[in-house]
Amino acid sequence: MHGWNRLTAFLLFVVAIPAAADCSRGGTAPIADLRAGVVAENGSVTVDGIVTGVFLGRNRLGGFYLQDDRQPPSGLFVYAPRLGPGNLRPGQRVQVEGRFVRFHGRPQVSRIDTIRDCGYAGRAEPVAVRLPEDAGRLDALQGVKVRFPDALTVTGNYELGRYGSLRLSSGGRLLRTGAPGSGANAHADRQIVLDDGSYRAEPDPIPYLDAQGTRRLGDTVQGLTGILTHAFGAHRLHPTREPSFIAANPRPEPPPAAPAPLRVSTLNVENYFLTLGQRGARSQAELQRQRGKLAAVVRGLDADVLALTEVENRREALTDLVRQINRGLPQGQRYAAVAHPDSGTDAIQVALLYRPERLDLVMTAADVDPVHNRAPVLGWFRASAGGPLLGVAAVHFKAKVGCPDTGDIDRGQGCWNRLRTNQARSLLEWIDSLRRDGAPVVIAGDINAYAAEDPLDLLRAAGKTNLAGRDLRPSGRYTYVFHGEAGQLDYLLAAPAVAKRVTAAGVWHINADEPPFLGYSGRRPASGPWRSSDHDPVWVDLHWR
């Protein structure tokens, strides 16, 4: 921001703006002309208008917004960081003399010489905006007081703890369920960022939290009113009235107790590392929090078989995780790890846990095809009381990150899509080669592909069914959120013969909807299972006798 003349700054800071000043002098520049570039930059200007938003004081924007009374209105930011917050109020007409500049492309008046109080003119009526809206119209309303009369849904909270902002959308939250690459423009037109009247990092207190200290995705807000602007690549609203949220997506209860003999679940442990300072915990305190969170998740899932992803590829890490989980469990509910025949050389591995009091482990195998960077592991299980075999294969396909410049680049399904598709093909061939007496196999884990992408198309073509899909509405079929879009990356997949035995299934939305600062390494880690990972666990109950 641009500095002030020291004497002027001192006077404005100490002395209130004079009331009933003479504002009749001519030569004022229309705000619309300033915004349109008619007036040269870095020159002295005089503007007048009605104060619509005051963002003065410590850790605020350091200024206020003016708006003219034309139709359509035009608005402008006045940068006045030394002006006390009690000197201005919305509805006040003022005349400002200063320097016209553009800050990061946004027009504003700074280096203030004089601010005159021209009396109270009444609060400006907000301009109604309904999403989806064309970006051109939103650009024309920058600096203007607006109101969103419709309900908006919280669809992104990644930057809430970092910058005090939420991503909102019209028509419900943004879902990644369609064909690859579809809906991108429509999603862009449906979004607005709710900011907090500042651009400071790590705000304290964190705004917009509920009584539980969270703000979950899926919550709603209606009648949002404030000043529209564009910064950091997005249209943003700085509210002039405190937003009132509705907890439309409350924290869910654990999956109900399973009446069926067998429950299988996925569980992403978000880099459970004993080696501190690597991908996982940075300190012993963070590791202890991570252990507590994961133990709470396992207790809530109450699964007989758990397919884990993102465990440090060290035997000691898996052993420690199992020990920590078992500490709070009674004897008949404790877990044992399936020994991975060949976990490969990647920094992380997949793993299988099971309850030996309820299940017998018959055989294990690993898919050592070099196409896999994390070798899948398969365990064949039979109920301790007897019954048919069931295989569970823990998998973790290549992520959509670390993209190459050429080759397997992003063509609408994220980079490495071709590799993930080849991993799916290899997995199917490997499972088919291991079939024991026609026993089916449940593929469990992180495919890193959305439901309509090539790897899932290939798995479906081979007869694999999304076991949790039957019991979930489309709006609930997600396990991960990226850039405000929710989609399913984690699956339990099996043949129709297994799907017929499903008695209940679901996704336990304990992670993806929660802000990251509640995680084990966050600014305000929550107790219990909340934000124990960035992926939600998927579970299924099977009538398997």
Per-region residue spans from a language model:
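Structural recognition of the beta-strand scaffold that forms the well-ordered cores
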Residues: 64-67, 96, 146-148, 193-194, ...
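Extended non-catalytic accessory segments flanking core domains
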Residues: 21-277, 283-297, 327-329, 359, ...
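Solvent-exposed loop/turn segments at secondary-structure junctions
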Residues: 71-73, 84-85, 101-104, 199-201, ...
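Structured beta-strand-rich core segments of catalytic domains in phosphoester-bond hydrolases
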Residues: 317-398
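Metal-dependent phosphoester-hydrolase catalytic domains
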Residues: 216-224, 228-249, 314, 356-383, ...
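N-terminal, active-site-proximal structural segment of metallo-dependent hydrolase catalytic domains
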Residues: 21, 236-349, 405-428, 439-440, ...
